[in-house]
Amino acid sequence: GVIVQSGNDAAVVIAEGISGTEDNFAAEMNMTAAKLGMKNTTFTNSTGWPDPELTTTAHDLALLSTAIIKNFPANKFPELYPIFKKKTYTLNGIKQGNRNPLLYGKSSQSKGVDGLKTGYTSESGYGLVASAERGGQRVIMVLNGMNSKKERSAESRRLLDFIFREYKNYEFFKSGEVIDKAEVWLGDVHHVSLV
């Protein structure tokens, strides 16, 4: 319900099940947000529904998305992350469709898309936090302020195609690889490695 269909009722049930109350859950979300470096985010509920004190930014949502993607395979429930890319989900005989427009359409446009979440509020419009991986390159895109589902769909496709067409990852050095040495004046050693 929460991931595929954006079920706010399911979000509240999960929050209350984990933390007892939605307020307690929001407090835990804020602690996690701080640990992730989400400096411009204050959660007040589990759904993201408008609240004068609820704030976040596209950058902070990208930080959260990165943490979700990095931590799912390593945690004890690796089977959960693939749910983000399910087009439909059936529970108790009720079939629910995923609202992420990037999962649908030509296979070239949806290639590598594996998440994450759509949203809508009257204040911020239609939004999407999307994730895709092609050829070993991972892209996380945060889009907000669209006027309709149709505009969200078209703009997210346009941006994702542009990003994969125009941006590439280049590895100049491997992590931990010694690039050079620097001289140390008056030290116990004469040189230190630059990595």
What is each residue range found by the language model?
Residues 1, 11-20, 47-53, 118, ...:
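Second-shell loop/turn segments in exported
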Residues 1, 17, 32, 83-87:
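Short acidic/histidine-centered micro-motifs embedded in hydrophobic/aromatic stretches
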Residues 1-4, 25-27:
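Signal peptide-directed extracytoplasmic domains
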Residues 5, 9:
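Active-site-proximal cofactor/substrate-binding loop regions of enzyme domains
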Residues 11-13, 44, 82-83, 172:
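Short, hydrophobic secondary-structure boundary micro-motifs
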Residues 15-67:
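Mid-domain, small-residue-enriched loop/turn segments at the edges of structured enzyme/sensor domains
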Residues 38-39, 53-55, 59-195:
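Domain-terminus/edge residues, biased toward the C-terminal soluble/receptor-binding domains
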